Regions:
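Residues forming the flavin
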Residues: 1-330
Length: 330
């Protein structure tokens, strides 16, 4: 898919730059004037190229923290937004299949059972499953040194022994201290570094059994569910890796979720931390025309801009943004 997209761009007269990143954006009189691209030559020398532009489609990822800092420093309008953090929860896939399919569990026509759960608590907070991976694996998704970040994936056959899902709770702008628009990024980093420390280094992840978590006790060993995180886990407590309001929200939500999915609160299910990158903690504010409200010619798009929260929503936002950009240039 990507190869065909690149080919079509080049056939239409476009240029594709690889192995480079945007390291500066020039804003003059409230409009974008140029971007600076930095790449590394074969001999290791850093090369910079200034490209004059009248329009920039800013479609960075939700973990492009260097871009967020650059935009803030250049005075581009941004705002805090609600995001979510938590852990990965793993169960035996066979148990999930039995809970959802009953006697039909194991039928190859059905395959591995997926689930989607959410719970609204009396506290006013909510917890929810995210990016559930049937027959899948917990993976490492760190993008900065000294931090542990988890994510999940399934191979095409969904034949892994475990299921896993993000188990998240919201972080609201009002939960964040101070007035820095990137306070959410700072909180993500704090949790990721705490997880790195709890995992005793080497990008080992902290892990805890659900039964121990619900009782507020640290875990010393695993049970029947073998963690799939590839760097290994350090048994203990995840309490110190996340803000107390997230820990308490997850602790209250798990038994309630088990009312809808039998066994979700199984004592030997595994929590692996931390999951901090489900969505962007900031939004690059744009108007109805799709452009930045502060910087003409800058078109924030997709997850990193804070207008999408997954593959399909990001793709849809990209299509709509492209249509508005083409209309503005026509």
């Amino acid at each position: 898919v990507v190869t065909n997209i690149l080919r079509q761009i080049e056939e239409a007269g476009g240029e594709v730059r690889t192995r480079c990143r945007m390291t500066d954006i020039e804003v003059e009189a409230g409009a974008v004037r140029s971007v600076t691209l930095t790449s590394r030559a074969a001999d290791g020398t850093l090369c910079e190229e200034r490209v004059e532009v009248s329009a920039v489609a800013l479609a960075c990822g939700h973990s492009a923290r260097d871009v967020f800092e650059l935009l803030r420093d250049r005075g581009v309008a941004m705002e805090r937004k609600t995001f979510a953090m938590g852990v990965r929860i793993e169960h035996l896939q066979a148990n999930v299949d039995r809970a959802l399919y009953g006697p039909a569990a194991g039928n190859p026509v059905l395959g591995a059972a997926p689930y989607k759960l959410s719970e609204h608590l009396p506290s006013g907070r909510s917890a929810f499953s995210f990016c559930m991976c049937p027959g899948g694996y917990v993976v490492s998704a760190a993008s900065e040194p000294g931090g542990v970040v988890t994510n999940g994936m399934s191979l095409s056959d969904r034949a892994g022994e475990n299921s896993n899902s993000g188990l998240l709770a919201n972080v609201f702008p009002t939960d964040l201290p101070g007035d820095d628009v990137l306070a959410g990024v700072a909180l993500q980093r704090e949790c990721e570094r705490a997880a790195f420390t709890a995992g005793v280094g080497g990008y080992v992840a902290p892990a805890q059994l659900v039964g121990d978590f619900l009782c507020g006790e640290a875990s010393s060993a695993g049970g029947s569910v073998v963690p799939t995180y590839p760097r290994g886990v350090a048994w203990g407590s995840i309490d110190g890796c996340l803000p107390p309001y997230i820990v308490e929200t997850l602790r209250a939500a798990i038994p309630r979720m088990a009312r809808h999915l039998h066994g979700f609160d199984a004592a030997d299910a595994v929590l692996t931390g931390v999951e901090t990158r489900s969505s962007s903690p900031v939004r690059v504010t744009r108007g109805d025309d799709g452009q930045s409200v502060s910087t003409r010619g800058l078109w924030p798009v997709g997850e990193g801009a804070g207008y999408a929260g997954g593959i399909m929503s990001a793709a849809t936002d990209g299509i709509l943004a492209a249509q508005k950009l083409v209309a503005a240039l026509s």
